[in-house]
Regions:
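N-terminal Rossmann-like NAD(P)+-binding domain of SDR-like oxidoreductases, especially those catalyzing
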Residues: 1-125
Length: 126
């Protein structure tokens, strides 16, 4: 007997205002009308709210925040089926002069998401 595929209906997309994240959000919006998306983005140099502004509404909501903020994750993760994790410090040349934001976001932030996913029984795609 074939297994049923898990279909999430309420997802969080971290980094959803960046290039890759916003394209994923648009894909979900255009191809999965039964899915609600919560975009979590810190809107640093790589994120732009304009990338998703046209689809904000009933099915797509925006939360301005940082993935390192455990209290914020405790507020928004419950009730979601899955987290799709695109948030990252990605301009690696900047890490030479200032590696701390890269460690904070890419390592600690991912850890915080893993902990929240475990705590609230939520799948994490990273």
């Amino acid at each position: 007997m074939a297994e049923e595929l898990f279909t999430p209906h309420n997802i969080i997309v971290t980094g959803g205002c960046g290039f890759i994240g916003s394209n994923f959000v648009h894909y979900v919006y255009n191809n999965h009308p039964d899915v609600h998306v919560t975009v979590l983005d810190a809107l640093t140099y790589a994120g732009n709210l304009e990338n998703i502004r046209g689809i904000l509404g009933d099915r797509v909501e925006f939360v301005h925040g940082n993935i390192c903020d455990a209290e914020l994750l405790d507020k928004i993760v419950p009730g979601h089926d899955a987290i799709v994790h695109y948030a990252a410090e990605s301009h690696n040349d900047n890490s030479i002069a200032n590696p701390e934001p890269f460690l904070k976001t890419n390592v600690e932030g991912t850890f915080r998401l893993l902990e929240a996913a475990r705590k609230y029984d939520c799948l994490l795609y990273t």
